[in-house]
Design a protein with these regions (language model features):
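Conserved AAA+ ATPase "SRH/arginine-finger" region at the nucleotide-binding site
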Residues: 104-106, 181-194
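Short glycine-rich substrate-engagement loop in P-loop NTPases that contacts/grips substrate
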Residues: 56-61, 99-131
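Dynamic helix-loop-helix/coil hinge segments at AAA+ ATPase domain boundaries and subdomain interfaces
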Residues: 32-58, 102-103
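Loop/turn-to-beta-strand initiation segments
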Residues: 73, 128-132, 155-161, 173, ...
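Walker A/P-loop
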Residues: 2-8, 12-31, 65-103, 118-121, ...
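Structural recognition of the conserved hydrophobic beta-strand(s) that form the central parallel beta-sheet
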Residues: 103, 134-135, 159-165, 184
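C-terminal helical "lid" of AAA+/P-loop NTPase domains
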Residues: 216-221, 227-242, 252
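Short regulatory helix/loop adjacent to the ATP-binding pocket of P-loop NTPases
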Residues: 150-153, 167-181
């Protein structure tokens, strides 16, 4: 059975489809945790819900094709904070029903990586399939090379997805860079954040309205970062609800933030 260096072993389409559908059903059935941040509650469940990144996710574009053609592969997602790197990694795992493990190169260490190897190995023995390993801030993971990539990557144990805010040509180790496809993510445009605002109001704050001036302030503060935008909206919306305010205006946003 053939695999690429970090990709999945070949398996019947029926198995892939069944696993993917099971993963989607599990996510849909899970209750929404109202204590979690707004950005987490609004995290997209399909690539069609992803805001922005049309150059990668539009019809016929490279990353969308990877989803549609059932071809998870090792990749590096390069872009500023809050543009969907973690979301896309999770969606890749969900789309194919693969387990997902996130490792931070800043907070994690070799022990965390070895634990991930053990979990991925157990999954491989149980299902015959690989695990998506997401390396946060992968420009710092110099020790990943010896601990993970050499002994375990060759076996197809992992489909590795790395996220970086730095230029991978200069910051990512060559062993990783040469075996991964680099996708460049862009800061969200104003219209993307407006779409996100409409979604948040519809799903989470149906009794609230945000006037045009307040909207401009929120978008300006976000600077293309969806997480920052939603955090600011959540603070404003929570204060408005507590005070019985139905329309958030520019004065209220300035006072809240």
């Amino acid at each position: 059975m053939e695999t690429d260096l970090f990709g999945n072993p070949d398996s019947p389409d029926t198995t892939k489809n069944a696993a993917a559908e099971a993963a989607k059903a599990t996510r849909k059935a899970a209750p929404k945790d109202q204590a979690s941040p707004l950005a987490e509650r609004l995290r997209p469940k399909t690539i069609d819900e992803v805001v922005g990144q049309k150059h990668l996710l539009g019809p016929g574009k490279a990353l969308r094709s990877a989803f549609e053609n059932a071809h998870p592969h090792s990749m590096i997602l390069w872009g500023p904070p809050g543009v969907g790197k973690t979301t896309l990694a999770r969606l890749m795992a969900d789309a194919f029903g693969l387990p997902f493990i996130s490792i931070s190169a800043v907070l994690g260490g070799v022990k965390d990586i070895r634990d991930a190897v053990e979990k991925a190995t157990a999954n491989r023995e149980r299902t015959g399939r690989s695990t998506v390993v997401f390396g946060v801030v992968c420009h710092s993971v110099f020790y990943f090379h010896d601990v993970v990539f050499l002994p375990h990557g060759v076996s197809g144990l992992f489909t590795f997805i790395g996220a970086t805010t730095e230029n991978p040509s200069f910051e990512v180790i060559s062993a990783l860079l040469s075996r991964s496809t680099v996708y460049v993510l862009e800061s969200l445009k104003d219209e993307d954040l407006k779409e996100l605002l409409e979604r948040a109001l519809e799903r989470e704050y149906p009794s609230l309205k945000v006037n045009e001036e307040a909207e401009k302030i929120l978008i300006g503060l976000a600077d293309g970062d969806a997480r920052r935008f939603l955090n600011a909206l959540e603070v404003s919306a929570t204060m408005a609800k507590d005070r019985g305010i139905k329309v958030i205006d520019d004065k209220f946003v300035r006072a809240a933030l």
